[in-house]
C-alpha cells in the first residue's frame, strides 16, 4: 500500500520534470542562434542560444537585445557583442505580416542593453523565434 502511495505521489513530479525538460529542448532547437555571442563568457546556466535574426547585409545572426531568458534564468550577452535593438514582440508582429523585418536597428551590447549605432538594415528569421 505504501509503495502505491509513493508512486502516485511522485508521478506528478516525474511528469512535470519530463515535460519541463522536453519543452526546453524543443524551444532551444527552434531558435536562430547568434553566431557573434561568446557563449563561453555567459553564466553556466545560460546554455540556450539567444533569440536572433539574420542580417540581409552579411547573412550573420545577431541577438534581439542583450538579455534573454534561458530555462528561467536571465542571461546577459557580453559587452561589445553586435545586436538588434528589437524585442521579441516587435519581431513577431513583423513576421506575421511578412518574412522580413524591414527596420532592424543595429547596436552593441553594453551592460545588458543593446545601444544603437545608428545603422538600420533589413533582417529575417531563419527559424521560428521563441523565448526559452
From Swiss-Prot:
GO terms for molecular function: C-C chemokine binding. Glycans are attached at residues 45, 69, 74, 103, 111, 117. It is found in: Secreted. Keywords: Disulfide bond, Glycoprotein, Secreted, Signal. GO terms for cellular component: extracellular region. Disulfide bonds join 48-70, 66-109, 83-114, 104-123. InterPro entries: EVA_Class_A. The keyword GTP-binding does not apply. It comes from the Eukaryota. Residues 1-24 form the signal peptide. Coiled coil: none annotated. Pfam families: EVA_Class_A. Salivary chemokine-binding protein which binds to host chemokine CCL5. This is Evasin P985.
